């Protein structure tokens, strides 16, 4: 068997995943805090004020990475859910459900920071703009997945039902991504592009990319931590799980 496939196969074992998550979750959190400190320092003290928005634009160094992550985490959740439904892989069920509260947090941060930025720029805390409205619907989808997963007593059936909802909700992602281009919108178009020329000066973009990296690291740490907790809960009757949780046998 291919070494990479063999590693993934072994990782599907609950005890192996527990050891992996216990080792690497703190690393993800540590790297996330370090890169976030660097990114925030650059955003607050190094980058000059915007010539149109003044210092108000600095909140975008939190808003933009959070918005990107709200979409990324949902897409990843749907992928895990699809794998779990097709191949009945328990670890993917756990990972999919662990994504939901993290993605909901990123979406809530996106909406909150967008409102804070919108008040001085648009003169209102909220507008039923296509981008804002679709992002709010995304938050409701996350909450729906969380609620459905919690409402069904059987853990595997709960994960499958919530995973199906997550897969159905994927159709919203392109709506959020292209809403500014498809409809008249107050929301500004993309100023930072992975491919193509960005409208923001390069001297102002490096803290943003550092913050994007910070959210990735933090997400990885949080995903591993939440998945490990769910894994231990499901395997609570096993000796290895008792030992890992520090409980007496």
Regions found by a protein language model. Name each.
Residues 1-249:
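Polytopic transmembrane helical bundles with strong interfacial aromatic enrichment
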């Amino acid at each position: 068997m291919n070494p990479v496939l063999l590693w993934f196969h072994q990782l599907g074992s609950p005890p192996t995943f527990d050891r992996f998550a216990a080792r690497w979750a703190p690393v993800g959190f540590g790297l996330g805090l370090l890169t976030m400190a660097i990114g925030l320092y650059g955003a607050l003290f190094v980058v000059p004020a915007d010539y149109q928005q003044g210092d108000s634009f600095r909140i975008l160094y939190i808003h933009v990475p959070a918005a990107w992550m709200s979409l990324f985490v949902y897409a990843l959740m749907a992928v895990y859910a699809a794998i779990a439904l097709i191949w009945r892989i328990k670890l993917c069920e756990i990972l999919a459900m662990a994504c939901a509260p993290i993605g909901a947090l990123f979406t809530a941060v996106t909406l909150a920071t967008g409102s804070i930025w919108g008040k001085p720029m648009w003169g209102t805390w909220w507008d039923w703009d296509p981008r804002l409205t679709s992002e709010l619907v995304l938050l409701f989808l996350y909450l729906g997945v969380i609620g459905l997963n919690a409402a069904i007593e059987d853990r595997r059936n709960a994960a499958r039902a919530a995973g199906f909802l997550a897969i159905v909700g994927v159709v919203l992602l392109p709506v959020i991504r292209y809403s500014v281009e498809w409809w008249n919108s107050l929301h500004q178009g993309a100023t930072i592009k992975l491919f193509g020329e960005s409208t923001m000066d390069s001297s102002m973009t490096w803290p943003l990319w550092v913050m994007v990296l910070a959210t990735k690291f933090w997400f990885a740490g949080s995903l591993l931590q939440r998945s490990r907790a769910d894994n231990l809960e499901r395997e609570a009757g096993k000796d290895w799980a008792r030992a890992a949780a520090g409980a007496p046998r």
